[in-house]
């Protein structure tokens, strides 16, 4: 029988299910966590977009159609376009646009911007407006999720973060917030001559593409012992997971989780 550790404070029913799954399985086991609004409160990529647009830092002026010679107008149009795409239900297009904001930067410059974003956001959760768009403010860890990650790690379960955000941004944030993960998979920028381009390696870690990423980067055949997400944009991974955990944000995923009797934390 596996030597199961029980010290972490998590939901007793969830803990029992984890122990049950560990006993059933053999060989290496893994769990997959979304990052934004799952491991942390709010979204590191959206926060970084706010920082970039506030400070007018975009370098690639070919990301939107039209005449983009007016720098102030371009930043306004970029952030408004992103949130309008989400509002219109064009999730894939919105997610693909926002991760292009690092186009024209070096990796080191992008990492610095993300770090400055985290420091400027602080931990007080609230909201503000930028260019008429309501923007979430503040970044902090989700303590219940971190306890769950630590419990899984304690029991030798590999923890992978699989996010639709820029892999660069998530890597900086996990390091800053000291989140213990074995692997980070996000949107992988194509870098040419040291400069980030507006193109990405496939498969894209967006919507159903998350499963393709899991099969390419984690396991071709095995499925997660546990999957955790905050939104129905991650439902493809949750559907493959033996234990399904939703972060309760009173959204569509919350309704699905309650209906299907998934765990909510």
Where are these regions (language model features)?
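Preference for short coil/turn "hinge" residues that link or interrupt alpha-helices
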Residues: 33, 95-98, 172
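Residue-level preference for alpha-helix termini and adjacent loops
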Residues: 39, 101, 189-190
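Non-catalytic pre-domain segments flanking phosphatase-related domains
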Residues: 1-35, 42-46, 50-64, 68
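A generic alpha-helix surface/boundary motif
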Residues: 43, 92-93, 168, 208
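C-terminal cap/substrate-recognition subdomain and adjoining C-terminal extension
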Residues: 2-13, 17, 23-30, 112-115, ...
């Amino acid at each position: 029988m596996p030597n199961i550790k029980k010290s972490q404070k998590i939901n007793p029913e969830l803990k029992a299910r984890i122990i049950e799954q560990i006993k059933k399985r053999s060989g290496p086991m893994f769990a997959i966590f979304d990052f934004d609004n799952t491991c942390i409160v709010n979204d590191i990529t959206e926060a970084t977009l706010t920082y970039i647009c506030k400070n007018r830092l975009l370098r690639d002026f070919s990301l939107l159609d039209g005449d983009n010679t007016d720098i102030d107008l371009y930043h306004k149009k970029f952030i408004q376009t992103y949130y309008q795409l989400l509002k219109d239900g064009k999730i894939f297009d919105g997610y693909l646009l926002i991760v292009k904001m690092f186009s024209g930067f070096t990796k080191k410059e992008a990492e610095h911007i993300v770090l400055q974003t985290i420091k400027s956001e602080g931990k007080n959760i609230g909201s503000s407006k930028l260019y008429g768009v309501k923007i979430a403010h503040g970044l902090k860890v989700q303590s219940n999720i971190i306890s769950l990650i630590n419990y899984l790690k304690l029991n030798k379960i590999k923890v992978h973060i699989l996010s639709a955000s820029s892999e660069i941004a998530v890597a900086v944030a996990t390091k800053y917030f000291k989140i213990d993960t074995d692997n980070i998979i996000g949107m992988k920028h194509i870098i040419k001559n040291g400069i980030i381009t507006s193109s990405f390696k496939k498969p894209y870690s967006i919507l159903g593409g998350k499963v393709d990423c899991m099969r390419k980067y984690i396991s071709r055949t095995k499925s997660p012992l546990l999957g955790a997400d905050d939104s129905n944009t991650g439902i493809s991974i949750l559907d493959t997971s033996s234990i399904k955990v939703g972060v309760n944000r009173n959204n569509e995923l919350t309704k699905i989780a309650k209906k299907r009797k998934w765990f909510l934390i």
